[in-house]
UniProtKB/Swiss-Prot annotation:
This is Uncharacterized methyltransferase Clos_1076. GO terms for biological process: methylation. Could be a S-adenosyl-L-methionine-dependent methyltransferase. Transmembrane segments: none annotated.
Length: 216
């Protein structure tokens, strides 16, 4: 798994400015950002009485939504600076050092959520991660992933061409360098693990996959 800690330690202080801004290269990626976070919460409303694990807490924006709506949350975040900011926002939430392939928590969960983070794993690591997360999830529990994904090769090609035409070169480099998958590649992993799933499109980049353990 690639080590992005230095990058995110540097980005931590300006991350919220990026996601909430309406005038930067990433504006369309984070379009309907709050709606996306709320949609994740909505997807696990039936699991509110259980325990929720959030991976890739970042600065705690999704965590804050979950806490305000009464969820019991444990957060995982590898970046020291991101953890610091999230803990300042949410001092009562347990946020520990870890990542998708290393969860130092001896508990099981009724829901596992992640937003704008799963793309840091390559496809093989995603397979390993979902298999690993399955071991922490109670029967009928849910895994919810919100991230940039592509519905087809043609859609990806057209989107990258548009980004290049718009001269959004930082975004273009990000889209090429990180591991943004085709939706079917991720849903196939869930199918092999015996999960049912739903898919929702939030903007031209971001989709939400909500997968239920034992749903098949």
């Amino acid at each position: 798994m690639a080590d992005f800690n230095q990058l995110f330690d540097q980005w931590a202080n300006t991350y919220d400015n990026t996601v909430f801004s309406t005038d930067n290269e990433y504006t369309q990626v984070f379009e309907r950002y709050e709606t996306t976070l709320q949609s994740i919460c909505d997807a696990i409303q039936d699991k509110k009485q259980g325990l929720t694990l959030e991976i890739g807490v970042g600065t705690g924006n999704l965590t804050k939504h979950l806490e305000q709506q009464g969820f019991q949350v444990i957060g995982i975040e590898p970046s020291k600076q991101m953890r610091r900011i999230a803990k300042d926002k949410l001092p009562h939430i347990e946020i520990v050092d870890g990542h998708f392939l290393s969860i130092p928590v001896a508990k099981t969960f009724d829901s596992i959520v992640t937003s704008y983070a799963f793309h840091h794993l390559n496809l093989e690591e995603k397979h390993q991660a979902l298999t690993y997360l399955d071991s922490f999830l109670n029967q009928s529990g849910k895994i919810v992933i919100a991230d940039t994904m592509f519905e087809s090769e043609e859609y990806k090609r057209e989107l990258l061409n548009k980004v290049e035409k718009d001269r959004a070169y930082n975004l273009l480099e990000d889209l090429k360098a990180e591991y943004y998958e085709y939706i079917n590649d991720i849903t196939d992993i869930f199918l092999n693990l015996g999960y049912s799933f739903t898919i929702s499109k939030m903007n031209k980049y971001v989709w939400i996959i909500c997968a239920t353990k034992g749903g098949l």
